[in-house]
């Protein structure tokens, strides 16, 4: 884990890696290439039980109170395991909401895994319709 700075970060990476191996085996990855995955995916509750959805969020909203570095470690392990599904975009959405307002009430459902977040990047591009 190149971004793990402390031994706790290495422990976190090891824990997430073990979770990924256990709940997202290669058969799940191959199946996800051929068929749509369940929503939420089968690993969603296991990730919630481990506190991963809210790892980077304030304890005030049910998160673990860690930061973006710890989230990056989790995302790196999910990426290394090629975990399909909405975990990464949901984590990014919750980080964006939290950056704007760390006590936003929507974060409670995201931290617990009861909700799945998404985000869209606004390019600032606009259009004007002409005609009917």
Q: Predicted segment positions?
A:
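A generic structural signal for solvent-exposed, polar alpha-helical segments
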Residues: 49-50, 93, 125
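General N-terminal targeting signals
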Residues: 22, 72-74, 91, 100, ...
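Short secondary-structure boundary/hinge segments and terminal tails
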Residues: 38, 64-65, 91-96, 115
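Glycine-rich, Trp-frequent "lid" loop and neighboring beta-strands that shape
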Residues: 63-64, 101-132
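N-terminal glycine-rich flavin-associated loop
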Residues: 85-102
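Juxtamembrane/interface motifs at transmembrane-helix termini
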Residues: 32-34, 95, 128
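DPxDG-like acidic metal-binding loop motif
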Residues: 73-78, 97, 129-132
């Amino acid at each position: 884990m190149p971004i793990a700075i402390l031994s706790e970060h290495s422990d976190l990476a090891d824990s997430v890696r073990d979770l990924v191996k256990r709940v997202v085996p290669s058969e799940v990855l191959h199946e996800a290439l051929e068929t749509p995955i369940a929503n939420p995916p089968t690993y969603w509750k296991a990730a919630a039980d481990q506190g991963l959805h809210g790892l980077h969020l304030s304890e005030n909203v049910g998160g673990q109170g860690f930061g973006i570095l710890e989230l990056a470690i989790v995302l790196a392990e999910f990426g290394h395991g090629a975990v399909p599904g909405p975990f990464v975009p949901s984590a990014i959405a919750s980080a964006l909401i939290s950056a704007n307002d760390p006590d936003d009430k929507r974060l409670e459902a995201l931290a617990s895994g009861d909700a799945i977040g998404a985000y869209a990047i606004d390019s600032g591009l606009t259009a004007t319709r002409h005609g009917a």
